[in-house]
Structures are given as C-alpha cells and as structure tokens.
C-alpha cells in the first residue's frame, strides 16, 4: 500500500539507507541511523543506481531503504526490489513519485524517524540460562505463543518438508496440560494445524487472519476475507511471471501469496521482489518480508501482535493476576508480537543468520528449534513441580 506522511526506518528490517546525492539536510538523519547500526550510502545519476550503491555496502536490496527526490531513482529502486522506497517531494511531484513506486512520500527528511531501543540478537541472554526467568514464569501463570517455521520447526529448503523439531510435540503436550498455548503461523490455518497435530490448543494461520480455538470454534478477520479473490488473481499472475525463475516457489494461501526465493539465484532476487511489490501496488495489497520469502497479504491493520492480544483476551483465567504472555519466534513478522509482549511478558527470539545479526525487540534468545523444545519441556516440568515446592 502506498501512503503519505511520516515513516520509520527500523533496524530490525533495514540494514542500510541510500540517499540520492541531490538531497540536503541528511546529516542529522545519518547520525541517528549510525547510532542504531544502520549503514548509509549515496547514489547519483546515470550508472550509479541504487543497486550499485547497495553493492558497495554489501547489503541486500531486500533489507535496504532508498530515499530519492527523483522519479528515476524511485523507479530504479522499485525495479531492484528494495525493501522501502521513500520519495521526497520538493517540487510538487508527489503523484509522480507514487506512480513510479515510492512506498511513501514526504516533503522533508524531518518526517523520517528512526526506531531505537532494540538490541542485536547476539547480545541477548539465553532464555535457558537466564537467572530467575523460569522461577518468575512459574510464580505467575504463563500463556505461551509459538511461531512455527524456524521456531518449532527447522527452516528447510522445501516448505512442504517442514515438521516439528525432535522432542517438540512431546514438550508441547506437557506444556498444554499446564497452561494455555497457541501456535501463530504465516502458513494456512489447516496447514499449520496438521503439521503440529496437537488437539485442544489455539491455532492461528496467515499471521492471525484465521484462527481456531481449543474447542474447534473458527474465527476469521472478515475485512481480510474480502481480499481472498484478489489474492487468488495475484497468485496466478505471479506464477506466470515468475515461473521461468529456477528455485522460486509461489505459494497461494487463503489469506496470502508467499513467494519463496531461498533456492533462487542471488542475482534474480531483486527481480522477484520487484514483481511482488508491483503486484502489491496493482492489487492494493500489503507486502511483508521474512526469511527468504516476500509475501502479499490483505491491506488490513492486523498482525501477530494484535492476534496475540486478541487470543489473550479470549483465554479463560481465574487468577487475580493477569496471564504472562511468552512469545517465541524467529522472523520479522514475529517482531509485531515481541512489541506487544515486551512491556509485560517474555519475548524470545530464535537466533539465525539469514538476516545477519539483526536487531530485535526480544529480550531473550534461543539458538535453535531444538533449544525451543528444550525450553518448552523445562517450563512444563517447572510448572508441574511448582505446587509441590509450595507445600
């Protein structure tokens, strides 16, 4: 979706920002970016296009922002699949910048803010070793939320080959007997439900656009459901357009179209991303990114964070103190859940290197889905033993 007004550069999603050389008053913004570890560079006209500038910084376009006052710079960035394109309207060219592919248009760089306060994944304490974490969770009843791919399951080359990590099902069964649990996935609801295979828990598919409660009650976001026919059309167009690209998989889901490029040639990824972002603009959808995937979904203000809060509100709870939400996830879309959990719960990121040592809103970390299974098993055991310790 194209929009106007203030925009935020997020070090969780962006590794660098490229400015065209005609822009002035960039010094303060550059200083803010450098303080949070986001690189900066410039590009000019002619052959010095944004993709060349990104190469100089050794950053992927999919994790890079372009800021340009000219249609040529915006167009070049869109054709190369950059993550965020900010147009700067200095001469009344707002509409042209939007047509050429700007994600947002500002009139002054003071409208661009920089997110602060996050830490790099490598800087976080291990959730299994953090002193007092487990005891604090046992003292108050937790509600535990899991992502699937990269959290309960290892990331694999073929998404259809992803299943629970060894020991995860048994650990989930033990934990579900002690506290509410939910699996929130970007996969279709039926898909993630089958892959986990544990009855009597919450499942959310398509980043929360569709859910089932432990009793089987089905819920869906009706505003998002209106986009289902459009997503079907976009999926067909992308399959035709990207079919000749070896290693690219277009996955049509009920509430989304995921384009996986993990097995594609690196020099074709920009074209893949550009095709998806063009479809976003053509069909008035929204783009999200993840680990070697770019996805179209309904342009509705809903995400895993809002889903988590909705589920919390629907959980039965007899105690006087509120439930403590724990969220475990690995991907960019999980950051929305970390944001809402952080003030009063426990956000845990599962480390990986697909996006380098990126920033995260999580407060703790685990190193792999195997460690997630271990953490889950340990928490279940401590919850089981808590009444014994109290007597």
Swiss-Prot record:
Pathway: Glycan biosynthesis; trehalose biosynthesis
Enzyme Commission (EC) number: 3.1.3.12
GO CC aspect terms: cytosol; plasma membrane
Keyword flag Cell cycle: no
Alphabetical GO biological process terms: dephosphorylation; trehalose biosynthetic process
Residues forming the catalytic site: 147 (nucleophile)
PANTHER family reported for this sequence: TREHALOSE 6-PHOSPHATE PHOSPHATASE
Family: Belongs to the trehalose phosphatase family.
Biological function: Removes the phosphate from trehalose 6-phosphate to produce free trehalose.
Protein name, entry field: Trehalose-phosphate phosphatase
Protein's organism: Mycobacterium tuberculosis (strain ATCC 25618 / H37Rv)
Taxonomic lineage of the native organism: Bacteria, Bacillati, Actinomycetota, Actinomycetes, Mycobacteriales
UniProt gene name: otsB
């Amino acid at each position: 979706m194209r929009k106007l007004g203030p925009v935020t550069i997020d070090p969780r999603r962006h590794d660098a920002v490229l400015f065209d050389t005609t822009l002035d008053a960039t010094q303060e913004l550059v200083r803010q970016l450098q303080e949070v570890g986001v690189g900066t560079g410039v590009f000019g006209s002619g052959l010095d296009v944004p993709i060349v500038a990104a190469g100089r910084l050794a950053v992927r376009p999919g994790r890079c922002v372009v800021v340009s006052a000219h249609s040529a710079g915006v167009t070049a960035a869109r054709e190369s699949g950059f993550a965020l394109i900010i147009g700067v309207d200095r001469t009344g060219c707002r509409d042209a910048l939007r047509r050429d592919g700007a994600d947002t248009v500002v009139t002054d760089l003071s409208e661009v803010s920089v997110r602060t306060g996050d830490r790099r994944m490598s800087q976080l304490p291990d959730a299994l070793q953090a002193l007092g974490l487990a005891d604090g969770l046992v003292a108050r009843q937790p509600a535990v939320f899991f992502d699937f791919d990269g959290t309960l399951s290892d990331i694999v080359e073929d998404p259809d080959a992803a299943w629970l990590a060894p020991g995860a099902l048994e650990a989930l069964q033990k934990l579900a007997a002690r506290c509410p649990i939910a699996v929130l996935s970007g996969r279709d609801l039926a898909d993630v439900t089958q892959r986990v295979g544990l009855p009597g828990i919450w499942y959310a598919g398509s980043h929360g656009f569709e859910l089932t409660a432990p009793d089987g009650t089905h819920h869906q976001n009706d505003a998002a459901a209106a986009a289902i026919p459009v997503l079907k059309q976009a999926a067909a167009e992308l399959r035709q357009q990207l079919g000749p690209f070896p290693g690219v998989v277009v996955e049509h889901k009920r509430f989304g179209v995921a384009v996986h490029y993990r097995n594609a040639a690196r020099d074709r990824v920009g074209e893949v991303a550009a095709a998806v972002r063009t479809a976003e603009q053509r069909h008035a959808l929204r783009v999200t990114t993840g680990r070697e995937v770019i996805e179209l979904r309904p342009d509705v203000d809903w995400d895993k964070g809002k889903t988590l809060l909705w589920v919390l509100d629907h959980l039965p709870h007899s105690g006087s103190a509120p439930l403590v939400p724990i969220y475990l996830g690995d991907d960019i879309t999980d950051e929305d859940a970390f944001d809402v959990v952080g003030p009063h719960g426990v956000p845990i990121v599962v480390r990986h290197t697909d996006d380098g040592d990126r920033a995260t809103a999580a407060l703790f970390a685990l190193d792999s889905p195997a460690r997630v299974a271990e953490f889950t098993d340990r928490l279940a055991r401590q919850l089981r033993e808590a009444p014994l310790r109290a007597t």
